Amino acid sequence: MSKQFILAIDQGTTSSRAIIFDKKGNIKKIAQKEFTQIYPKSGWVEHDPMEIWASQSSIVREALEYARVSPRDIAAIGITNQRETTVVWDKNTGQPVYNAIVWQCRRTSHICDEINKNEDLKKYIRKNTGLIVDAYFSATKIKWILDNVDGAREKAEKGDLLFGTIDTWLIWNLTKGEVHATDFSNASRTMLFNINTLEWDKKILEYLDIPVSMLPEVRSSSGDFGHTHPSTLGGARIPIAGVAGDQQSALFGHCCFEEGMAKNTYGTGCFALMNVGDKPVFSDAGLLTTIAWAEDGKPTYALEGSVFIAGAVIQWIRDGLGLVRSAEDSEYYATKIDSTDGVYLVPAFVGLGTPYWDMYARGTIVGITRDTRREHIIRAALEAIAYQAKDVLDCMKEDTGLDWAGLRVDGGAVQNNFLMQFQSDILQSEISKPKINEITGLGAVFLAGLAVGFWKDKEELKTILTTEKTFEPKKDPETVAHDYKGWKKAVQRSMAWAE
């Protein structure tokens, strides 16, 4: 057996995963391990970087062992990761100076408020990074660590500290410190990377007082990120050849290679991306402009809409409210009634993303009457996921003038047929669910496989992806418009709540 497999390292917000694929895209083995979510204060979210590395390395070894695959049988590794989450570590010891500050964390909202008072800087950041100023992105998280961790700024100015998003942290550990690099897609989510010049932006770095020496080298998403150190994976030196942030990786996994193709991923958050080609398109409707991936140093751009809370609202009604015993139960209860009877749940637990960008919005349930039951709340939670996706996808149509012949979907929540049908109804569009649900991991191995010749070209990749189920709209446009109007009203109730 020689080089018959390719490995995806899929490091997510709540779990570390390893997926072994064969050349036909079949999954040989998936291994997964959850890790600790740390909430030091209201609105703060952290992870332990050492626990992330320990969980990810152990789960890779477990996947290989259970699949009876030798590390030497792996042609390459593709890495995909939760984006924006920020790690700062000492390059001499390899030890983090603080916990990883997670993308969901709102602790730097006050820094963003100060930036937003500077209209010229705010516009500069929008035009050159493609992002809006928000605590979501890495830039202000790095500044917070440098300003609040004892000795961090002094060490950084001496050149002793390194920054990385999770991909960079994993690459550093896999290579035992030989490679400090990221890819274009992850770099474009830091609010420090100029997507026009394709370099770290000196003006933003200077304003935030972040030394450029901390930042990783930016490389093509499909290409050379070094090899695993023999001590990390059973003595083998496996090429790390594909890297992309989770949402961009999913776009690649869906084979959305042409301009105008779009996908929506339903995970902890909800993320829609549309391929807009080889030149950035800037949004008038609150969408982010981002780099989807880069090959041979040439980027493909995308528009993205980010919803902070999607699948996490189902976790909340299960764990927080105890309304269901499992996520799967939500579909059962939602289909026991014909509608929510005017109940809307807006899951703005950590603010609202696209197109509202309100850091101070908070969750709300409206329309409750004496007749409201468990089923109405559960159904409203599921519908909220679809409504938020519609908010984003409508903006994409508006900004690009492009429509799509259907939408490609993936993520844990696509197993919920009620949600997918409701999504098709309110979009008045076809929804396609692929047979392979591990699209994010597939995108990472597609990028890695192209780099090492495991697959020859994108046309071959398209033959691997097949559709399992298609959802067609069943509701009439008038009903959809009425229900969506109620959603927009509910969103207004949730906004500008926190201080």
UniProtKB/Swiss-Prot annotation:
Q: What PROSITE patterns does UniProt report for this protein, alphabetically?
A: FGGY_KINASES_1, FGGY_KINASES_2
Q: Is DNA-binding given among the entry's keywords?
A: no
How the protein is activated or inhibited is described as: Inhibited by fructose 1,6-bisphosphate (FBP).
Which PANTHER family does this entry report, sorted A to Z? Answer: GLYCEROL KINASE, SUGAR KINASE
Q: Which UniProt keywords apply?
A: ATP-binding, Glycerol metabolism, Kinase, Nucleotide-binding, Transferase
InterPro entries found in the cross-reference section: ATPase_NBD, Carb_kinase_FGGY, Carb_kinase_FGGY_CS, FGGY_C, FGGY_N, Glycerol_kin
Please tell me where sn-glycerol 3-phosphate binds in this chain. Answer: 13, 83-84, 136, 246
Q: Which GO terms describe its cellular component?
A: cytosol
Query: Nucleotide-binding as a keyword?
Result: yes
Gene source species: Francisella philomiragia subsp. philomiragia (strain ATCC 25017 / CCUG 19701 / FSC 153 / O#319-036)
Q: Which GO terms of the molecular function aspect are on file?
A: ATP binding; glycerol kinase activity
Q: What is this protein called?
A: Glycerol kinase
What reactions does this protein catalyze? glycerol + ATP = sn-glycerol 3-phosphate + ADP + H(+)
EC numbers, comma separated: 2.7.1.30
Residues at which ADP binds = 13, 17, 268, 311, 412, 416
**Purpose:** Key enzyme in the regulation of glycerol uptake and metabolism. Catalyzes the phosphorylation of glycerol to yield sn-glycerol 3-phosphate.
